[in-house]
């Protein structure tokens, strides 16, 4: 039940329009043509080539070993089959360390078929987001738990609690002002994610950030209940058990996001 015509490809301006219209956005990760084709045909609005592939595809303990070449390879595979969903690709660890490196990596990803790049964090990344946007490269920001910062954070932990909540809101305003088209909020308490969503004009896409975000994203392996070799986060729901097939699971997930039934309190974090 989407107000965006099923046959109409998503564009960057359409994402902002969706927020203005109160239309929830549905996002999933994909790393190959087969899953991407199924997601595209069953109601997914955005597909993310996540550097999560380092953990769920390559078997690493973090996303840090993923390279730009890895991202380009998977982006090409997915881009070949998409008809409707907008394709976002991560800038992997280190690729956004300087504006020049970020531009080079972004150009490679856009030439491979991505329509937007995702950058983790704020701070000096705000200037890099602005640098890319000024060069006509759409950017998705990523705040809260940023997996590329796992060494500094000491693990995969909830972010934005206590005094950190105010900083998260300020960071969200900063990346939006720099020109980010959308932003992912990961592992953030529901009230804080709701405050961020109300504070910015760009859509927020939650993953473990509660139901009041403007959309939701899950990792392919998590939403299908596949064993990725890592502890399953609280916010994950197995939609394959409900949907009975990958296509059915995709439709069930898309419907649950759009009608607001996912995520519920069981799949979110309190303050």
Curated annotation (Swiss-Prot):
Binding site for Mg(2+): 51, 90, 120
List of residues binding 3-methyl-2-oxobutanoate: 51-52, 90, 118
Catalytic EC class: transferase
Pathway assigned in UniProt: Cofactor biosynthesis; (R)-pantothenate biosynthesis; (R)-pantoate from 3-methyl-2-oxobutanoate: step 1/2
Chief localisation class: cytoplasm
Keywords: Cytoplasm, Magnesium, Metal-binding, Pantothenate biosynthesis, Transferase
Cofactor(s) listed in the protein's UniProt record: Mg(2+)
Oligomer status and interactors: Homodecamer; pentamer of dimers.
UniProt function note: Catalyzes the reversible reaction in which hydroxymethyl group from 5,10-methylenetetrahydrofolate is transferred onto alpha-ketoisovalerate to form ketopantoate.
Record-linked NCBIfam families: panB, PRK00311.1
Name of the molecule in the record: 3-methyl-2-oxobutanoate hydroxymethyltransferase
Source organism of the structure: Stenotrophomonas maltophilia (strain R551-3)
């Amino acid at each position: 039940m989407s107000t965006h015509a099923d046959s109409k490809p998503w564009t960057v301006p359409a994402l902002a329009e969706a927020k203005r219209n109160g239309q929830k956005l549905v996002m999933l990760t994909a790393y190959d043509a087969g899953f991407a084709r199924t997601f595209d045909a069953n109601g997914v609005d955005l597909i993310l080539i996540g550097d999560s592939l380092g953990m769920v595809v390559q078997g690493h303990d973090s996303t840090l070993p993923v390279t730009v070449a890895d991202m380009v390879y998977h982006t090409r595979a997915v881009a070949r089959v998409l008809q409707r969903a907008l394709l976002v690709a991560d800038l992997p660890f280190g690729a956004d360390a300087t504006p020049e490196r970020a531009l080079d990596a972004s150009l490679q990803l856009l030439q491979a078929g991505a329509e937007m790049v995702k950058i983790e964090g704020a701070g000096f990344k705000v200037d890099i987001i602005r640098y890319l946007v000024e060069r006509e490269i759409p950017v998705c920001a990523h705040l809260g738990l940023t997996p590329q910062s796992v060494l500094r954070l000491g693990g995969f932990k909830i972010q934005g609690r206590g005094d950190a909540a105010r900083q998260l809101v300020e960071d969200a305003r900063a990346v939006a002002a720099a020109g980010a088209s959308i932003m992912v909020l990961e592992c953030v308490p529901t009230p804080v994610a709701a405050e961020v969503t109300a504070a910015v004009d760009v859509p927020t896409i939650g993953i473990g950030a509660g139901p009041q975000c403007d959309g939701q994203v899950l990792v392919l392996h998590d939403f299908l209940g596949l064993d990725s070799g890592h502890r399953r986060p609280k916010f994950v729901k197995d939609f394959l058990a409900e949907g009975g097939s990958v296509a059915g699971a995709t439709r069930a997930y898309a419907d649950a996001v759009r009608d607001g039934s996912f995520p519920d309190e069981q799949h979110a974090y309190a303050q």
